[in-house]
């Protein structure tokens, strides 16, 4: 839809941001909307919290469309900390603690690792897993606990595809935040690294070749719509240390799991280092730390502050930071519209018709039972905010649903 309005949007946005006396000068200069004066800085270097250049746009409650873009520019909120940082590493490496501390020091928004609770616990707090006794086996819940205890189950393929979808959805939310507020984000894992788990599961025989094919087709159909991160931080631990950490944090289903064998953990390490980190480093900056004995977030922040992200702007053919190199303000606005206003369209790219993998297909009879049970559960009959039996009020005066609700 945005393409229809592109010409008019470019003219209107440019007219609102350009001075007539500078038109000639700008023909010889790069009108990049996202030019930085310095590198990322932490609170210690700044001497206090980040001061926004402009008030954040309320993207969670207010739509951002072509018409909003005419009056509300995107790049005016950007500063040196308007970045996407992804924290990666093996299981039990200490990513959550580190990512939280990093986000706090850099004054960025923290996005924790996703899990299936985002699907199984609805907006009213009801756990849909309670419905399992009423559902046929193909429609029952299957989350990380189930995977750890029974990794060869037919629903393992669906589990990993759902994890990728959740990471994809969360990454879109993170892009919404950066483009609408100017505040950077720190994510624990990302859709770009999700494939290492799928490949490790396939190598260990937990996924069929057909399920792997479906996953790869879904990934190929969706991943190109996102903007790659500016920085990836990898916390490295050898396999023996990972196993010790899993035992130390004492999560029952992890300790009892047959999944976290030397072979599976070695596959994860190999896939991370030989494929993911190698590929993502062509675009993003990469920092790798030996986290066997933990580490200090302050040291990492100092290393981040030394990175000159602006050095790649001079060469327009350099692949580094290429996804974030938009020369026109209108292009920034279009990217923001894409992630803020058109998220449902992006999620629809997962609708790839593949019916040749039995474990990813449920029968019509099972599907009917699932619909009848699922959508009669507490809080599931109508959209959130419209369920009178759950205490929602003012139904007669409500005329619209929330932004991104139900996605």
From Swiss-Prot:
Gene3D superfamilies assigned: P-loop containing nucleotide triphosphate hydrolases (3.40.50.300)
One GO term describing the cellular component: mitochondrion
Bound cofactor: record note: Binds 1 FAD per subunit.
Principal place of residence: mitochondrion
Any one GO biological process: mitochondrial electron transport, NADH to ubiquinone
Tissue localization of expression: Expressed in muscles (at protein level).
Transmembrane segments: none
Location relative to the cell: Mitochondrion matrix; Cytoplasm
Key words, A-Z: Cytoplasm, Electron transport, FAD, Flavoprotein, Mitochondrion, Respiratory chain, Transit peptide, Transport
Cofactor(s) it depends on: FAD
Pfam families, A to Z: dNK (PF01712)
InterPro entries in UniProt: Deoxyribonucleoside_kinase, DNK_dom, NDUFA10, P-loop_NTPase
Gene null: resulting phenotype: RNAi-mediated knockdown leads to loss of ND-30 and reduced mitochondrial membrane respiratory chain NADH dehydrogenase (Complex I) activity. Larvae exhibit elevated reactive oxygen species (ROS) and an up-regulation of Hsp60. RNAi-mediated knockdown in the eye results in retinal degeneration exacerbated with aging and accompanied by high levels of ROS and accumulation of lipid droplets in the glia. RNAi-mediated knockdown in neurons results in lipid droplet accumulation and increased levels of peroxidated lipids.
Transit peptide: 1-60
Subunit structure: Complex I is composed of 45 different subunits. This a component of the hydrophobic protein fraction. Forms a complex including sicily, ND-42 and Hsp83; the complex is necessary to chaperone ND-42 in the cytoplasm before mitochondrial import; the interaction between sicily and ND-42 is direct and occurs preferably between the unprocessed forms in the cytoplasm.
Role played: Accessory subunit of the mitochondrial membrane respiratory chain NADH dehydrogenase (Complex I), that is believed not to be involved in catalysis. Complex I functions in the transfer of electrons from NADH to the respiratory chain. The immediate electron acceptor for the enzyme is believed to be ubiquinone.
Entry's family note: Belongs to the complex I NDUFA10 subunit family.
Name recorded for this polypeptide: NADH dehydrogenase [ubiquinone] 1 alpha subcomplex subunit 10, mitochondrial
The species this protein was found in: Drosophila melanogaster (Fruit fly)
Gene symbol of the encoding locus: ND-42
């Amino acid at each position: 839809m945005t393409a229809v309005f592109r010409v008019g949007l470019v003219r209107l946005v440019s007219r609102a941001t350009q001075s007539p006396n500078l038109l000639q000068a700008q023909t010889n200069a790069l009108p990049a909307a996202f030019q930085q004066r310095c590198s990322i800085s932490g609170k210690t270097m700044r001497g206090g919290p980040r001061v926004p250049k402009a008030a954040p746009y309320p993207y969670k409650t207010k739509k951002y469309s072509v018409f909003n873009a005419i009056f509300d520019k995107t790049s005016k909120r950007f500063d040196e900390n308007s970045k996407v940082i992804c924290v990666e590493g093996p299981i039990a490496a200490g990513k959550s603690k580190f990512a939280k501390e990093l986000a706090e020091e850099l004054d960025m928004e923290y996005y924790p690792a996703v899990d299936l609770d985002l699907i199984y616990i609805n907006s009213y707090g009801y756990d849909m897993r309670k419905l399992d006794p009423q559902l046929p086996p193909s429609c029952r819940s299957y989350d990380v606990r189930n995977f750890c205890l029974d990794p060869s189950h037919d629903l393992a393929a669906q589990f990993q595809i759902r994890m990728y979808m959740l990471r994809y959805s969360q990454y879109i939310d993170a892009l919404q935040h950066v483009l609408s507020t100017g505040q950077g984000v720190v994510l624990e894992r990302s859709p770009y690294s999700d494939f290492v788990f799928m490949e490790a599961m396939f190598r260990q025989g937990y996924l069929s070749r057909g399920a792997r094919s479906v996953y790869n087709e879904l990934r190929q159909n969706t991943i190109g719509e996102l903007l790659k991160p500016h920085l990836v931080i990898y916390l490295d631990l050898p396999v023996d240390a990972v196993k010790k950490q899993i035992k130390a944090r004492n999560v029952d289903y992890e300790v009892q799991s047959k999944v976290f064998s030397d072979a599976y953990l070695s596959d994860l390490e190999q896939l991370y280092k030989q494929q993911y980190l190698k590929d993502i480093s062509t675009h993003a900056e990469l920092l790798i730390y030996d986290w066997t004995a933990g580490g200090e977030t302050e040291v990492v922040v100092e290393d981040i502050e030394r990175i000159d992200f602006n050095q790649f702007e001079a060469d327009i053919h350099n692949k580094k930071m290429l996804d974030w190199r938009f020369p026109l303000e209108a292009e920034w606005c279009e990217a923001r519209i894409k992630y803020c206003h058109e998220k449902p369209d992006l999620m629809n790219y997962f609708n790839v018709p593949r019916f040749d993998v039995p474990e990813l297909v449920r029968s019509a009879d099972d599907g009917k039972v699932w619909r009848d049970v699922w959508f009669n559960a507490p809080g599931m009959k109508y959209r959130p905010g419209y369920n009178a039996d759950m205490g929602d009020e003012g139904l007669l005066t409500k005329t619209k649903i929330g932004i991104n609700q139900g996605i």
